[in-house]
Swiss-Prot record:
Keyword DNA-binding: yes
Signal peptide location: none
Every ATP-cone domain range: 49-139
Named cofactor requirement(s): Zn(2+)
Keyword Zinc-finger: yes
InterPro entries noted in UniProt: ATP-cone_dom, NrdR-like_N, RNR_NrdR-like
Disulfide bonds: none
Name under which the protein is recorded: Transcriptional repressor NrdR
GO MF annotation, one: DNA binding
Species annotation: Acidobacterium capsulatum (strain ATCC 51196 / DSM 11244 / BCRC 80197 / JCM 7670 / NBRC 15755 / NCIMB 13165 / 161)
Highest taxon listed in the record's lineage: Bacteria
Function: Negatively regulates transcription of bacterial ribonucleotide reductase nrd genes and operons by binding to NrdR-boxes.
Gene designation per UniProt: nrdR
Keywords: ATP-binding, DNA-binding, Metal-binding, Nucleotide-binding, Repressor, Transcription, Transcription regulation, Zinc, Zinc-finger
Length: 168
């Protein structure tokens, strides 16, 4: 490694440790010529996953952006940050397992909504209201009705008791 102070190409590693995220290794090095110390980081050279926005722009997949959106949707809900991080991990794993390097925001959003629906319906509705960009209250109401109908026990829907889909 070339010394940033004197340009000499010989050094020795004084200390190595893994980062908190376990995605890089931090190395303290000492130049063999000037004896000054400097830090280097070693990271895996990952192939970026691109997200195709609705307007056609392409951006690198940003897990922090996804997590931030989920945290907003789950604010004041009984969902741990660990569960949300796992949800983002699953989404990233899905992207990595795929041969395709580009995914639309629509596909990623639908995947996240489906997972969020299983986790917490209120958070799902919050996320969907931003993601789906409902044009009016009726669209929002339809989504709620579909959610309520799908959550209702099958026996209540068949018998037509109060609150079921057959009462409409």
């Amino acid at each position: 490694m070339k010394c940033p102070y004197c340009g000499f190409a010989q050094d020795r590693v004084v200390d190595s440790r893994e980062s908190k995220e376990a995605d890089s290794i931090r190395r303290r090095r000492e130049c063999e010529r000037c004896n000054k110390r400097f830090t280097t980081y070693e990271r895996i050279d990952e192939i970026p996953y691109m997200v195709v926005k609705k307007d056609g722009r392409r951006e690198k997949f940003d897990r922090h952006k996804v997590l931030s959106g989920l945290l907003r949707a789950c604010e004041k809900r009984p969902i741990s940050a660990t569960k949300l991080e796992n949800l983002v991990d699953e989404t990233e794993a899905y992207l990595m397992d795929s041969a395709e390097r580009e995914r639309s925001t629509t596909e990623i959003g639908l995947l996240l909504m489906e997972k969020l629906k299983q986790l917490d319906t209120v958070s799902y509705i919050r996320f969907a209201s931003v993601y789906r960009d409902f044009k009016d209250v009726n669209e929002f109401k339809e989504e709620l009705e579909q959610l309520l109908t799908s959550k209702e026990p099958l026996s209540r829907r068949r018998t037509g008791k109060a609150g079921s889909a057959q009462d409409e």
